Swiss-Prot record:
GO terms for cellular component: cytoplasm. It is found in: Cytoplasm. Its main location: cytoplasm. HAMAP family: RRF (MF_00040). The keyword Cytoplasm applies. Responsible for the release of ribosomes from messenger RNA at the termination of protein biosynthesis. May increase the efficiency of translation by recycling ribosomes from one round of translation to another. It comes from Streptomyces avermitilis (strain ATCC 31267 / DSM 46492 / JCM 5070 / NBRC 14893 / NCIMB 12804 / NRRL 8165 / MA-4680). One of its GO terms (molecular function) is ribosomal large subunit binding. Keywords: Cytoplasm, Protein biosynthesis. This is Ribosome-recycling factor. It comes from the Bacteria.
Length: 185
């Protein structure tokens, strides 16, 4: 029973780290990359659809992305969704593809993105700690109900704390890399 609780907690913590990676990838740096478009949704026949399901992305130059819609009728909606996103870009289309040129990041914009990254990192750590708290409550309940011994419960809590520290450290490491990437001129 304790092993299941610990395993479930670790899986949820792993998911929190994966979400943090995705969030960090969506934050714009000085270079273009396809992951920047992952969180953008466009209206496609009345349904909000992630644009990574509506188009393919390529990066022919460090500061330019080319978006090729699978369905040409979605071109205008995809372009509008990119324009309305928080990427701070003005896409242009030639009727077949959308070109997105990324301007150089100003120092002020870099600092804003670092704040966003720190917020996303803190959200991930809060999520990890929440998983830890729920797992600890489950372990305490098992001890209280007499299903496991006090010593076994304390060992499980120590293992849970070690797992929590490991995943929080992973988020800190991801954040450190993202900050370095953002400060790179």
């Amino acid at each position: 029973m304790i092993e299941e609780t610990l395993l479930e907690a670790e899986e949820k913590m792993e998911k929190a780290v994966v979400v943090a990676k995705e969030d960090f990838a969506a934050i714009r740096t000085g270079r273009a990359h396809p992951a920047m478009f992952n969180k953008i949704v466009a209206d496609y026949y009345g349904a909000l659809t992630p644009i990574n399901q509506l188009a393919s992305f390529s990066v022919p130059e460090p500061r330019m992305a080319v978006v090729t819609p699978f369905d040409k009728s979605a071109l205008r909606n995809i372009e509008q969704a990119i324009r309305d996103s928080d990427l701070g870009v003005n896409p242009s289309n030639d009727g077949n593809i959308i070109r997105v040129v990324f301007p150089e990041l100003t120092e002020e914009r870099r600092k804003d993105y670092i704040k966003v990254a720190k917020t996303k990192g803190e959200d991930a750590k809060v999520s990890i700690r929440s998983v830890r708290r729920k797992a600890k409550d489950a372990i305490d309940k098992l001890i209280k109900d007499g299903e496991v011994g006090e010593d076994e419960g304390r060992r499980a809590e120590k293992e849970l704390d070690d797992t929590t520290a490991k995943y929080v450290a992973q988020v800190d490491e991801l954040l450190k890399h993202k900050e370095a990437e953002l400060l790179e001129v």
